[in-house]
């Protein structure tokens, strides 16, 4: 049976987001802006970065290059629920993009990209690879959120 990478991506996008929401929903208000060290990101900062990355990738796949801080600035709201809503909006856009493509189209370079985008990405943008980057980035920061909560006394193996 031939593997369907599109279905794999959809499953993984749903799974990692489910884990992120489960973890984020346990964050208490005093923990939301807590920094493990002054030079480290708070839970809020990590959630904004996760969302900003997805906004950045989604914008890139539309053939537009924006700076990372510009993508993060598009994440509106200060409280946890507002940022979770922004994460949901970005994920819906990613899933809509995926659903508009066949499995094969996900491996075709995005056409007619400006040269500055190709230069930035160091070549063609393959949608499957870009979405896989989004997944890897989100899962990495989910681990940080879990670890940061562990530092505050929440053992994920005993919750």
Segments and roles (model prediction):
Residues 26-27, 56, 93, 97:
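Short alpha-helical scaffold segments that flank and stabilize functional sites
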């Amino acid at each position: 049976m031939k593997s369907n990478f599109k279905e794999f991506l959809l499953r993984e996008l749903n799974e990692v987001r489910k884990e992120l929401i489960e973890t984020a929903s346990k964050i208490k208000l005093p923990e939301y802006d807590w920094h493990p060290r002054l030079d480290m990101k708070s839970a809020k900062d990590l959630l904004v970065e996760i969302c900003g990355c997805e906004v950045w990738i989604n914008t890139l796949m539309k053939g537009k290059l924006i700076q990372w801080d510009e993508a993060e600035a598009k994440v509106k709201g200060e409280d946890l629920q507002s940022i979770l809503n922004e994460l949901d909006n970005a994920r819906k856009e990613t899933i809509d993009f995926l659903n508009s493509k066949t499995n094969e189209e996900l491996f075709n370079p995005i056409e007619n990209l400006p040269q500055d985008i190709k230069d930035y990405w160091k070549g063609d943008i393959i949608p499957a690879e870009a979405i896989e980057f989004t997944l890897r980035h989100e899962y990495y920061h989910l681990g940080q959120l879990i670890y940061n909560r562990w530092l505050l006394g929440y053992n994920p193996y005993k919750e």
